[in-house]
C-alpha cells in the first residue's frame, strides 16, 4: 500500500507521521484535512501512526512528531518537524512541485 500510494504516486504526497497521544499532532490534523480538500486534484495527503507503523517511522528516521514529509516521484523532497501553520505547510508542498 505504501509503495503504490506514496512512492508510485503521480502526484506529490504529504505524509503526516503522528501518534494519537501527541497534542501538536492533534492540532495539525484539521489543517492537513483542509489542505487535502483544497488541493485534492494535485496532492495526496496521508497519515502514518508511528506507534502502529514503527518500521516506516524508522525508515524515514522519525525522531520527533509531528513530522511532515513531502514525496515526489518516489523520493522524500521536503521535511518538517513540529507544528506548522497552514501557510508554511502549503509553501513546503508548493516548493516540492
What are the residue ranges of the model-derived segments?
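Structural micro-motif
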Residues: 13, 54, 60-69
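A short beta-strand-turn-helix
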Residues: 1-13, 54
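Residue-level signature of catalytic and energy-coupling elements of molecular machines
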Residues: 2, 15, 32, 49, ...
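Conserved helix-turn-beta segment immediately C-terminal to the redox Cys motif
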Residues: 10-12, 27-48, 52
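Short pre-active-site segment immediately N-terminal to redox-active cysteine/selenocysteine motifs
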Residues: 10-11, 18-21, 64
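Conserved redox-active cysteine motifs that mediate thiol-disulfide chemistry
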Residues: 17-31
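Non-catalytic, surface beta->alpha helical segment in thiol-disulfide oxidoreductase systems
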Residues: 64-97
Amino acid at each position: 500500500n505504501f509503495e503504490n500510494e506514496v512512492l508510485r504516486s503521480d502526484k506529490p504526497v504529504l505524509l503526516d507521521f503522528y501518534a494519537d497521544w501527541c497534542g501538536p499532532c492533534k492540532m495539525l490534523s484539521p489543517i492537513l484535512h483542509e489542505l487535502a480538500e483544497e488541493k485534492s486534484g494535485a496532492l495526496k495527503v496521508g497519515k502514518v501512526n508511528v506507534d502502529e507503523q514503527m518500521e516506516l517511522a524508522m525508515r524515514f528516521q522519525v525522531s520527533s512528531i509531528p513530522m511532515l514529509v513531502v514525496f515526489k516521484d518516489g523520493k522524500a523532497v521536503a521535511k518538517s518537524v513540529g507544528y506548522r501553520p497552514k501557510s508554511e505547510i502549503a509553501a513546503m508542498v508548493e516548493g516540492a512541485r
